[in-house]
Amino acid sequence: LALGFSEEELDSIVPISKMRKLVEERTEATPDNRFYKLNPKVDDIPEKYGRTCNGVKLLVLGTVETANSGCVCPEHVMLKRIINNLVLHRDDVVILDMEAGLEHLGRGTTEGMDYFVVVIEPGARSVQTYKNVKRLAEGLGIHQVHVVANKVRDEKDEAFIREKIPAEDLLGMVHYNEQVIDADRQGCSPYDFSQKAVSEIRGIKEKIDKTNM
């Protein structure tokens, strides 16, 4: 929704991980076949299944939800190959919006990325998550791990963030904003609702450009 897609457009998108026939076709995995390709063809998938809005192509990968599937299953192999193809074999800017948590790091799904932006809130558990993400990311060879503090309400929150996050890692803060909440309730992009939030995010983007040079 933040990109400008309508709810109807988003509801019509089927995540790649849910496209069972596609996964079986590319990996040659079936319920009766425990052996499958570890290097399925994926280079055509972004063009075939991506949706474009405002100059941004959105590809919904989905998650692997099979119980006890472990780290290696046909769906996971497929998703990891798609990400690797986008990151390593194309001259595009790729932004991965990952679910909160550490699972994607444990599976190595984000290996090959140049830059991590960890979105936290003013709280001890959120700060600890950032520390864990940074440690695991460095284990994957990713040393650019930075923080955006979200839903910052007041000076106490600001002081907490500045105390807990090293200045060189902090990209900026996005303050709690009722206009952004209203936009979310209406299923609209906050871009058209709050110039303050847009200004804060632009400042973060400019800092990313500087730290990623």
Please describe what each predicted stretch is.
Residues 1-54:
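N-terminal phosphate/diphosphate-binding loop that engages ATP/GTP or pyrophosphate donors
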Residues 64-66, 100-101, 123-125, 152-155, ...:
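Conserved nucleotide-binding/hydrolysis micro-motifs of P-loop NTPases
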Residues 42-62, 84-89:
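Switch I (G2) and immediately adjacent beta-strands of P-loop GTPase domains
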